Amino acid sequence: MTATAQQLEYLKNSIQSIEDYPKPGILFRDVTSLLEDPKAYALSIELLTERYKDAGITKVVGTEARGFLFGAPVALALGVGFVPVRKPRKLPRETIAETYELEYGTDQLEIHVDAIKPGDKVLVVDDLLATGGTIDATVKLIRRLGGEVHDAAFIINLFDLGGEQRLEKLGIHCYSLVPFPGH
């Protein structure tokens, strides 16, 4: 099933926009409203699964926390393993970490050292692409473990915040279901 304009419009309409959140001047795109609509949630998983069903994906990686909500069901539908990438000290086994820049400081992500094997063909899934910092760090973690990142897939792309261009510089193709301007 290729996504139709009607399906994509349905998904877009299921995402609420909240003005002045988390601070004045920001228009927040709330993907949790899509999750509250079982038709929209199922459709988003179906469309992502359909796109990647014949791509030879061996692992799906989801970033904390909303990436888990989309990545895990896609992995299940594809019949492959799901790998969580988390904030520091949230994973129980041995991990490697990658630090990345935030607007005001830095943060870090971790992955289990045995979660990705050399040669794994990985799909990275998250709810939203903005500046690309989180996915940049996630891609670096996967590559350090010998995995090949096939694509990065998102529900929402805030297309004017530069995330897609940042990831393309890393050789990562981005796919998103719903484009919005960033604010």
Swiss-Prot record:
Signal sequence span per UniProt?
none
Family according to the record: Belongs to the purine/pyrimidine phosphoribosyltransferase family.
Keyword annotations for this protein, in alphabetical order, are:
Cytoplasm, Glycosyltransferase, Purine salvage, Transferase
The reactions it catalyses are: AMP + diphosphate = 5-phospho-alpha-D-ribose 1-diphosphate + adenine
So what does this one do? Catalyzes a salvage reaction resulting in the formation of AMP, that is energically less costly than de novo synthesis.
Q: How does it assemble?
A: Homodimer.
Q: Which PANTHER family match?
A: ADENINE PHOSPHORIBOSYLTRANSFERASE, PHOSPHORIBOSYLTRANSFERASE DOMAIN-CONTAINING PROTEIN
Q: Does the keyword Acyltransferase apply?
A: no
Q: Name one GO molecular function term.
A: adenine phosphoribosyltransferase activity
Enzymatic class: transferase
Q: Please, one GO biological process term?
A: AMP salvage
Alphabetized InterPro entries for the sequence = Ade_phspho_trans (IPR005764), Adenine_PRTase (IPR050120), PRibTrfase_dom (IPR000836), PRTase-like (IPR029057)
Record the organism: Klebsiella pneumoniae subsp. pneumoniae (strain ATCC 700721 / MGH 78578)
Entry protein name: Adenine phosphoribosyltransferase
Question: What's the gene?
Answer: apt
Hey, which pathway is this one from?
Purine metabolism; AMP biosynthesis via salvage pathway; AMP from adenine: step 1/1
Q: What Enzyme Commission number(s) apply to this enzyme?
A: 2.4.2.7
Q: Which SUPFAM superfamilies does the record match to this protein? A: PRTase-like
Q: Cell wall biogenesis/degradation as a keyword? A: no
